[in-house]
């Protein structure tokens, strides 16, 4: 019975995300402002550990892994457009 109610709810409410792994388009992202020190640390950590955003976020107080990944993607997307 609970699964029937859940599937009905998913059909009537299109704003529910079916999977946490879905990507959000860049149009829905707000630009993340980072201090220069944060940017430097993100760049250095990325060179060391790659896309381990949780690990990088653990070194920057007040920042989530999602914010750092979004910042990285947007920053590198802008660089590729400038080339």
From Swiss-Prot:
Citing just one GO molecular function, the answer is: DNA-binding transcription factor activity
Superkingdom of source:
Eukaryota
Localization, per the record, is: Nucleus
Write down the InterPro entries for this protein, in alphabetical order.
Answer: Homeodomain-like_sf, Myb_dom, Myb_TF_plants, SANT/Myb
Q: Does the keyword Ribonucleoprotein apply?
A: no
Q: What else is known?
A: Overexpression of ETC1 results in the suppression of trichomes and overproduction of root hairs, as observed for CPC, TRY, ETC2 and ETC3.
Role description: MYB-type transcription factor involved in epidermal cell fate specification. Acts as a negative regulator of trichome development, by mediating lateral inhibition. Promotes the formation of hair developing cells in H position in root epidermis, probably by inhibiting non-hair cell formation.
- The name under which this protein is listed is MYB-like transcription factor ETC1
For this protein, the record's Pfam families field holds: Myb_DNA-binding
Intrachain S-S bonds? none
Cellular component, GO, one term? nucleus
A single GO BP annotation from the record?
Answer: negative regulation of trichome patterning
């Amino acid at each position: 019975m609970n699964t029937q109610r859940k599937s009905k709810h998913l059909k009537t409410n299109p704003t529910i995300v079916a999977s946490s792994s879905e990507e959000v388009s860049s149009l829905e992202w707000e630009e993340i402002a980072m201090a220069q020190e944060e940017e430097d640390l993100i760049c250095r950590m990325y060179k060391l550990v790659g896309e381990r955003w949780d690990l990088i976020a653990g070194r920057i107080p007040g920042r989530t892994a999602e914010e750092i990944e979004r910042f990285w993607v947007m920053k590198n997307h802008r660089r590729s457009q400038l080339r």
